[in-house]
Structure formats: C-alpha cells, structure tokens
C-alpha cells in the first residue's frame, strides 16, 4: 500500500539563544496542507532572508516529491504498457493445443489387430479341421467296430452251422453204418437160409417134393434202397430247410444290419454336422467375445486417453484462467494505483498552487532588525523584556494532526 501523505513539515525547533526571539514562535499548521507550518515567513527565526531559504527548501522538497511521483507514474505507465504488450504478444503467440498425432500408431495397432484376428480365425479353422478329422476317425472306428461285430456274428453263425453240419454228417455216418450192418445181417440170413435149404434137400433127397405156398420173399435190397432214399430225402429236406432258414435269418440280419447301418450312418452324419455347426458357432462366439473384449479395451483406452487429454485441457484452461485473473488483478491494481497517483498528482498540484498563492499573497515582509518593534505591516511587536537575550522557554513542539486532511482518502 502506498501512503502518499506528505511528511510533517512543521519545524520542531526550539528557540535559539539568539537575542530577542519573539515568544510567538509556536509552530502552527496551515489547514488542509498536510501539516505544512503556517508561520513560515511570518516568524523571524533567523532574521531577514530566512523566509526565502525555507520557501526554496519547501518548494525544492515539493518539486522533488512531485518529480518522484511523476517518475513513478511514468514507470507504472511503462510497466502497464509493457504488461499489455506482453499479454497481447502472449495471446498472439499462444497456439491452440494440438493433440499429438497417433494415427500412425492407430494404423499399426489396427494392422496388428487384423493380423491377430486372422491368426485366430486360422487357428479356429485348424481346430475345426482337427475336430473334423477326429470325428471322421471316430466314425471309421465305429464302422470298423460295427463290421467287426457283424463279422463275429457271421462267424458265430457259420460255426453254429458247421456244428449242425457235423452233427448231420455224424447222423448220416450212423445211418450208413446201420445200413451196412443190416446188409451184412441180410447176407448172413440169406446164407444161413441157403445152407438150411441145402441141408434139408440133402437129407430128404428126391423123395419128398414139398410145395409150399408161401408169401413172396421180400427184396431187402429194394427195401434198403427205399429206406436209404427216404433217409436221404429226409436229410436233403432237413438240409434245405436249414439252409433256407439260415438264408432267411441271414437276409433278415443283413436287412437289419443295413437298416441299422443306414440309421447309424445318418445319425453319425447328423452328429458330425451338428458338431461342426457347434464348433463353428463356438469359434464365432469366441471371435465375437474377443472382438467385444478388444472393443471394450479400445473403448476403455480411448476414454482414458480422452479423459487425460480433457484433464490436461482443463488444467491448461485453469492455468490460463488463473493467469488471466492474476493479470486482470494486476491491471486493476495498477489502474487503481495509477488512479491514486493521478489523484495525488492533482492534489499535489493543487496544494502547490495553494502554497504558491499563499506565498504570492503574503504582503508582510520580515524586518531587517531582529529587535524591531514594528514589521512591514506597521504592527507593533513587543520588545524583548529579558536581559541580554536570555533564552526563552522552549517552544512547544508542533503536534501533528491525527490524519492528513487532503491525503487521508488515498491512504491504502
């Protein structure tokens, strides 16, 4: 704060030991003149010519103060102009905030993301191919196991038929053995019969001719042949029946196997298609999840980047606003100081004019003789009563006013 009140210019002087100093030398101040003594030029302190010296000193002091105030006003004006030029230059030179160019990095990131997505799709395609190969291997393994089961069933059926054929062969052998035994028995019976007939003939000779009406003999060969034919027909019939049954069972089993194989093939094909569809959907779902994650990460990074940029811009705006506020405050303060200085200058010029008018209007002159009884105005001055210029009582020091009247309103 500036206190532009003038210092107390009242001369706090005690009466000197010079002879005949009047007792009316108490310091008084001019009203509204910042404690400028009013008895300057009227009280004969230092005889004739002291008024001119005090006036010169006062005027010199006031001129120096006025020159210093004017110099300070000019300095403040220069500082204000310099600040205004700096503000203008700063506002002209300040470039808008340019965000760094990350387009090349973004393009590189996009290319890398595309490569990653291509690699992921290629990996997914390879995984699908591997799964398809595994499914095809499973299908071939299932077919192999099915064919192996069918082969085992056919082999078991063939073994069963072979056992039946062996049993039939054994039965045929038994029947052939029985036929041979019956043939041998028939031969034995025939030979025994012929022997008996020959024996009887030899005993009876020709004496007896017996004619016996008997049933015609049975042809055993024919009977055996018929029996053989019947058994062979029966065996052939049984064999044909068994073969027909086997063929029917085999055809039915083949039909069932074919239908089951077709159903199994269709089911396996459908399962393979469904698995492929599921794998493709899983791959697509994984790709969508990855895309969503990448987009979320990109969104998060973008939000973070733009929030950081926004914070930087806000901080820059805050700094600029604070600088502008400080500059405005400085400008207002300097304007106020400048205004105060202008007011002080005007007040000082007014006071100087007042002092000059007072000094010019002073028509009383100091006497040349310090012990004169009259002054230039013809007024009587009381002579010194004391003996050879004894020192008078000390003058009461000038009590300064509590405040300067004209300058009080400018004290900050």
From Swiss-Prot:
SUPFAM superfamilies: Intermediate filament protein, coiled coil region. Keywords: Acetylation, Coiled coil, Intermediate filament, Keratin. Residues 1-55 are annotated as: Head. It comes from the Eukaryota. InterPro entries: IF_conserved, IF_rod_dom, Keratin_I. The modification N-acetylserine is found at residue 1. The keyword Cytoplasm does not apply. GO terms for cellular component: intermediate filament. One of its GO terms (biological process) is epithelial cell differentiation. Wool microfibrillar keratin. PANTHER family: INTERMEDIATE FILAMENT, KERATIN, TYPE I CUTICULAR HA1. There are two types of cytoskeletal and microfibrillar keratin: I (acidic; 40-55 kDa) and II (neutral to basic; 56-70 kDa). The low-sulfur proteins, derived from the microfibrillar fraction of wool extracts, are composed of two families, each consisting of 4 homologous subunits: the type I components (8C-1, 8C-2, 8A and 8B) and the type II components (5, 7A, 7B, and 7C). This is Keratin, type I microfibrillar 48 kDa, component 8C-1. The lineage of its organism: Eukaryota, Metazoa, Chordata, Craniata, Vertebrata.
């Amino acid at each position: 704060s500036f206190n532009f009140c003038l210092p107390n210019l009242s001369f706090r002087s005690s009466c000197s030991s010079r002879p005949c100093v009047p007792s009316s030398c108490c310091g008084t101040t001019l009203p509204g003149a910042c404690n400028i003594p009013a008895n300057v030029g009227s009280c004969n302190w230092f005889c004739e010519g002291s008024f001119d010296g005090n006036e010169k000193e006062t005027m010199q002091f006031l001129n120096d103060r006025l020159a210093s105030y004017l110099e300070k006003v000019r300095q403040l004006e220069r500082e204000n102009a310099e600040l205004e030029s700096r503000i203008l230059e700063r506002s002209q030179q300040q470039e808008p905030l340019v965000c760094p160019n990350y387009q090349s990095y973004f393009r590189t990131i996009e290319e890398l993301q595309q490569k990653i997505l291509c690699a992921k799709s290629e990996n997914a395609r390879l995984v699908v191919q591997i799964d398809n190969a595994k499914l095809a291997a499973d299908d071939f393994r299932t077919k192999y196991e099915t064919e192996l089961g069918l082969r085992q069933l056919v082999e078991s059926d063939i073994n069963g038929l072979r056992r039946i054929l062996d049993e039939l062969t054994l039965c045929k052998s038994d029947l052939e053995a029985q036929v041979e035994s019956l043939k041998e028995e028939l031969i034995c019976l025939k030979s025994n019969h012929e022997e008996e007939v020959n024996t009887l003939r030899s005993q009876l000779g020709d004496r007896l001719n017996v004619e016996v009406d008997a049933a015609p003999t049975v042809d055993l060969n024919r009977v055996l042949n018929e029996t053989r034919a019947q058994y062979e027909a029966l065996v052939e019939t049984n064999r044909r029946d068994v073969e027909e049954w086997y063929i029917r069972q085999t055809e039915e089993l083949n039909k069932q196997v074919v239908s089951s194989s077709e159903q199994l093939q269709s089911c396996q094909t459908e399962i393979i298609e469904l698995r492929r569809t599921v794998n493709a959907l899983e791959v697509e779902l994984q790709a969508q999840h990855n895309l969503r994650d990448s987009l979320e990460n990109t969104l998060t990074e973008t939000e973070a980047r733009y929030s950081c940029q926004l914070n930087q811009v806000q901080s820059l705006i805050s700094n600029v606003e604070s600088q502008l506020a400080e500059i405005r405050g400085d400008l207002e303060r300097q304007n106020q100081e400048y205004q105060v200085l202008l007011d002080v200058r005007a007040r000082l010029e007014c006071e100087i004019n007042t002092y000059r008018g007072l000094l010019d209007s002073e028509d009383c002159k100091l006497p040349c003789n310090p012990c004169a009884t009259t002054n230039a105005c013809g007024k009587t001055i009381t002579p010194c009563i004391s003996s050879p210029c004894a020192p008078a009582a000390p003058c009461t020091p000038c009590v300064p006013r509590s405040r300067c009247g004209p300058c009080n309103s400018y004290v900050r």
